[in-house]
Amino acid sequence: MLLLWVSVVAALALAVLAPGAGEQRRRAAKAPNVVLVVSDSFDGRLTFHPGSQVVKLPFINFMKTRGTSFLNAYTNSPICCPSRAAMWSGLFTHLTESWNNFKGLDPNYTTWMDVMERHGYRTQKFGKLDYTSGHHSISNRVEAWTRDVAFLLRQEGRPMVNLIRNRTKVRVMERDWQNTDKAVNWLRKEAINYTEPFVIYLGLNLPHPYPSPSSGENFGSSTFHTSLYWLEKVSHDAIKIPKWSPLSEMHPVDYYSSYTKNCTGRFTKKEIKNIRAFYYAMCAETDAMLGEIILALHQLDLLQKTIVIYSSDHGELAMEHRQFYKMSMYEASAHVPLLMMGPGIKAGLQVSNVVSLVDIYPTMLDIAGIPLPQNLSGYSLLPLSSETFKNEHKVKNLHPPWILSEFHGCNVNASTYMLRTNHWKYIAYSDGASILPQLFDLSSDPDELTNVAVKFPEITYSLDQKLHSIINYPKVSASVHQYNKEQFIKWKQSIGQNYSNVIANLRWHQDWQKEPRKYENAIDQWLKTHMNPRAV
C-alpha cells in the first residue's frame, strides 16, 4: 500500500515539472518513443465528467492534464478480437473479416508495429494481444456461428461479484501485474540503453470480469472481482442505477442479448450497484498499472521523450440496458477511453471530434514520420492533438465527422452497424429492413432510452444512406451469415459422432439439456436454408 501511495504522490508531483517543455520536446532530433497501453472493457465515459466522479483514476487524470483526451472515441467492433484486429490493422471490421472472437487477422499480417520496426524502431509487446485467428473457447465460437438459429438459450451464468476482504491486497489481477512488471523491467533494462526510438505495447485484461470456475446454477458466470483496497477508491454515492425498459418494450435484438446473458430475471438495486461498484474498482486497479508505466518513464528520464497513449478495446455495460459484458452499440459498451500525452501533444486539450480505434494505426506511423498507406480506414490523430497545428478548419476536414462500428459475434442475433455523427447515433441491423433500426439523440438522451427513428424519419433515412455509402451492410450481413454456416458445418463434421454430446455441454447446457432434440432440429433446419452473399 505504501508503495502505491508513493506512486500516486509522485504522479501528482510530475504535473508541476518542466513547464513549457512541450515546445522543446517536439523539436527533438530523433522521433519520439511510443508507449501504447490497451486495457479490456474500460468504459470511456469514466475518463471525463461526470463519469470521472465515480472512481479515483489518478494516472488517467494525470494524462488528461498533461495531454489530450478524446471525448468521443469508439471501438470499431465491441468485442475483443475484432476490435483489436481493427486497431492493429487500421481497417474496419468488414475489411479484416474478423467476424467474431475466433476469426481475427492472419498471424503474419503486417501491423503498425511491424512497419515501425522496419523503419528503425525497437519494438516489444507484453500482455494481451488477441487480434489473430484461432483463439477463444469452442462455446464462444459455436454461439457466434449459431446466432441465426431459431432458438433462445442462456449462454452465460448470472453475473456475480466477489470481494477480497483485505485492505492491503493491491495486486488482485496477478497476470496483468506480471505483464506490467515485465514491461517496466524492459524499460529499465533494455529501452534505456537504446540509441534508436522504441515502441512498446502493454495489453491488460482488466477490467474485464473474471470467468467463474464454479459449477452448479451459475456455471460459466462472469465475476466482478476486487479487493477492499480498490473498492475504497469508488464513490458509492456517485454510482448511478441505470434505468431499464420493460422486457416487453425492449428492442428485439436487445432482448436476445439480455436473455442469452442471463439478465432477464430479477435484480435488486443492491445487486446492480454492487456489480457497478466492483467494476469501477477494477478500473482503479487498471489505472494503477498504467501508472507504473508512467512512473517508470519518469524515473528513467524518458517521459519527456515518449508519447504515451491509453485506450481500450471496448467498454463494459455493467448492467446498463439490462446487460453486462459488451457486444452492444450502447455507450457503455462502444465508447472507449483514448488519451495521449508526450512531445508535441497539446496539454489539457479535450477533443470532441468522433474518432475510433482504426485511427491508432495511422497515428503510430505519423508519430514515427512514416508515410501513411492509402488503404487505411483510419486517420492520424496528431492533427487533432498537436501543439503546433493551428488551422482548425483543416483539422475538421482531416477526420470525417463520423465513425463506423459493427458487430457480428455471439450474444447478438443480427449483424449490427453503428454510425456515430455529431450528436446522433444510428444503429442498423442485418439487411436494414427485417429489423427496426435505432436512432438516439445523445445530446438530449445520453442514456439511450428513447429510440427516435420513427419520430425523425428524414434523419434516419439520411444516416442510413450515409451508412450505405461507407459499407454495403446488407451484403456484409449475408456474407457473415454464410460464413457462420460454413464454419459450423466444418466444426460439426470434425466432431463426428460426438456432436450431440459436445453441443449439449457447451455454456448453454442448462437450457439445451431440457429439450436437446428440439434444439438440434432447429440447427438442422437452419443449415438447410442456404444463402448466396453474391445474390444480395
From Swiss-Prot:
Q: Quote the InterPro entries the UniProt record gives.
A: Alkaline_phosphatase_core_sf, ARSK, GAG-degrading_sulfatase, Sulfatase_N
Q: What PTMs does it carry?
A: The conversion to 3-oxoalanine (also known as C-formylglycine, FGly), of a serine or cysteine residue in prokaryotes and of a cysteine residue in eukaryotes, is critical for catalytic activity.
Q: Which gene encodes it?
A: ARSK
Q: Which reaction does it catalyse?
A: an aryl sulfate + H2O = a phenol + sulfate + H(+); Hydrolysis of the 2-sulfate groups of the 2-O-sulfo-D-glucuronate residues of chondroitin sulfate, heparin and heparitin sulfate
Q: What is this protein called?
A: Arylsulfatase K
**Molecular function via GO:** arylsulfatase activity; glucuronate-2-sulfatase activity; metal ion binding
| Predominant subcellular localization, coarse grouping | secreted
Q: Which sites are catalytic? A: C80
Q: Where does Ca(2+) bind?
A: D40, C80, D313, H314
Changing C80A has the effect of: Loss of arylsulfatase and glucuronate-2-sulfatase activity
| Phylogenetic lineage | Eukaryota, Metazoa, Chordata, Craniata, Vertebrata
